[in-house]
């Protein structure tokens, strides 16, 4: 449909948003992200009904409070099995996760002069993946916020609300 121009982007968010807005425990964000990506890939592949038994997700869900009627299902929608999945992270654990299971990462406010700080964690994820993954087949796509103004202070002022939201409103 998109001619290969679609990318799935996932982020673990932060405890204030996950617990305050979504109403679920923040728990283990890296484990949750890895499992979610594994499940998405199974759905995209459409090789059969999806079953998954992870720490965070079970499909079908047989936990307390369920009816027991759930059964493994196969998506009725045909999607490209190779849709790229990127994660958004700047934490070492999140970057290792991206290197291990994702096709790319969206580092928020990445300083290009400090790539080595991010790169080390990403490459540790490549090693954990154990499949010869490298920067040749992995995208680092920084999230960049731009404010153009001849007055440098006014440009900074335009960015302050975004920084406050992401750092104070979503962070912990």
Protein language model features and the residues they cover:
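Active-site-adjacent structural elements that line small-molecule/cofactor binding pockets in enzymes
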Residues: 1-172
């Amino acid at each position: 449909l998109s001619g290969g121009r679609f990318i799935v982007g996932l982020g673990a968010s932060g405890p204030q948003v996950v617990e305050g807005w979504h109403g679920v425990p923040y728990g283990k964000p890296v484990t949750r992200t890895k499992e979610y990506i594994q499940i998405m890939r199974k759905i995209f592949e459409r090789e059969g009904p999806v079953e998954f038994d992870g720490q965070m997700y079970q499909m079908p869900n047989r936990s307390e409070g369920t009816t027991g009627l759930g059964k493994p299902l196969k998506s009725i929608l045909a999607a490209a099995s190779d849709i790229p999945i990127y994660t958004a992270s700047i934490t070492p654990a999140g970057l290792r996760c991206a290197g291990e299971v994702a096709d790319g990462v969206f580092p928020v406010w990445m300083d290009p002069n400090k790539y080595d700080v991010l790169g080390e964690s990403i490459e540790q994820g490549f090693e954990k993946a154990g499949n010869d993954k490298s920067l040749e087949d992995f995208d680092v796509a920084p999230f960049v916020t731009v404010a153009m103004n001849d007055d440098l202070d006014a440009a900074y002022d335009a960015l302050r609300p975004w920084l406050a939201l992401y750092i104070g409103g979503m962070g912990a």
